């Protein structure tokens, strides 16, 4: 029966590529990275839990691994930074074997390979509980200042990068983080704030407004609705726009800008009043997206 050290040795073989920034790769107590003196280090962490973010009875382990890495990459996109390295932890149920752990890792690695950065370390344990995974990601600004959520200004336009709603039908596992799109937007110098839509448009817009001390006037008729929201609405008897506003896990970017943008969908304006209203008068904009109960 294979154990932890067999798995670690296998991971070392999977991460054997040479990277000029990695001075000490997986296998030691800590990874050692060389960091450019003129670059910012940007750090984020995210976790996924069986029964909350995925269902291990339904979703393949490689898809689960890909999702936990992509959630972190979506946070990189939200701040327009480039991923540079990651470390991961896996708390594996004792009912799962080393082959399952390998598939989880290969999913994480596949997501990292898309954006050409290494997994440089981590930790694995087994326990009598459901699968839990955590990834900590290290990002770099690479010449572009990070875009935050607290710098929206009255008069800014509000945009999203893609259609929303119904992600639970599958896109919450297969989404592609908008890292490249975020860099393109940031290079324009016109984006004033940004966030990824993980908790739902209504709640994530509220985050921007609260942190920036502003409000918003949305036009519900302009919000792009994904076909999945239409499909889901026939199952839930809710309007597609409700799914677009509140479902979450779309992982599109929600951003504000001081000028018209050729990329994305315009959905409203930032206002001085600290409230969020629907200018079309058709929907309630009370935040109903995801929030963990502590």
Where are these regions (language model features)?
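Residue-level signal for inorganic ion chemistry
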Residues: 32, 72, 80, 119, ...
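Active-site-proximal betaalpha loop/short-helix elements
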Residues: 95, 173-249
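Small-aliphatic-rich amphipathic alpha-helix that forms the alpha element of a beta-alpha
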Residues: 61-85, 106-114, 184, 201-211
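Glycine-rich anion-binding loops of enzyme active sites
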Residues: 11, 48, 82-168
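Acidic, Ser/Thr/Pro-rich beta/coil linker or hinge segments at domain junctions
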Residues: 263-294
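General beta-strand structural signal in soluble alpha/beta enzymes
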Residues: 23-25, 42-45, 118-122, 160-161, ...
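Extreme N-terminal cap/leader segments of soluble proteins
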Residues: 1-60, 79, 88, 103, ...
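Short hydrophobic/aromatic beta-strand micro-patches
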Residues: 138-140, 254-258
């Amino acid at each position: 029966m294979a154990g932890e050290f067999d798995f670690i040795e296998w991971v070392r073989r999977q991460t054997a590529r040479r990277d000029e920034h990695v001075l000490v790769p997986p296998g030691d107590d800590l990874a050692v990275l060389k960091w450019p003196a003129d670059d910012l280090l940007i750090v984020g962490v995210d976790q996924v839990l069986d029964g909350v973010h995925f269902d291990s009875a339904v979703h393949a382990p490689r898809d689960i691994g890909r999702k936990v890495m992509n959630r972190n990459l979506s946070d990189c996109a939200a701040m327009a930074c480039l991923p540079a390295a990651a470390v991961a932890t896996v708390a594996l149920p004792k009912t799962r074997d080393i082959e399952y752990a390998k598939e989880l890792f290969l999913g994480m690695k596949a997501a990292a390979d898309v954006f050409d950065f290494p997994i440089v370390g981590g930790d694995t344990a087994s326990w009598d509980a459901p699968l839990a995974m955590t990834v900590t990601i290290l990002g770099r600004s690479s010449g572009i200042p990070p875009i935050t959520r607290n710098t929206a200004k009255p008069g800014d336009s509000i945009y999203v990068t893609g259609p929303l709603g119904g992600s639970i039908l599958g896109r919450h596992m297969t989404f592609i983080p908008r890292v490249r799109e975020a860099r393109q937007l940031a290079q324009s110098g016109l984006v004033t704030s940004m966030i990824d839509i993980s908790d739902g448009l209504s709640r994530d817009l509220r985050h921007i407004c609260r942190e920036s001390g502003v409000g918003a006037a949305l036009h519900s008729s302009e919000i792009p609705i994904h076909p999945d929201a239409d499909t889901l609405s026939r199952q839930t008897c809710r309007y597609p726009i409700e799914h677009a506003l509140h479902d979450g896990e779309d992982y599109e970017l929600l951003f504000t800008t001081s000028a018209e943008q050729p990329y994305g969908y315009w959905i409203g304006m930032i206002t001085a009043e600290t409230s969020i209203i629907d200018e079309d008068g058709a929907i309630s904009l009370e935040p109903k997206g995801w929030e963990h109960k502590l």
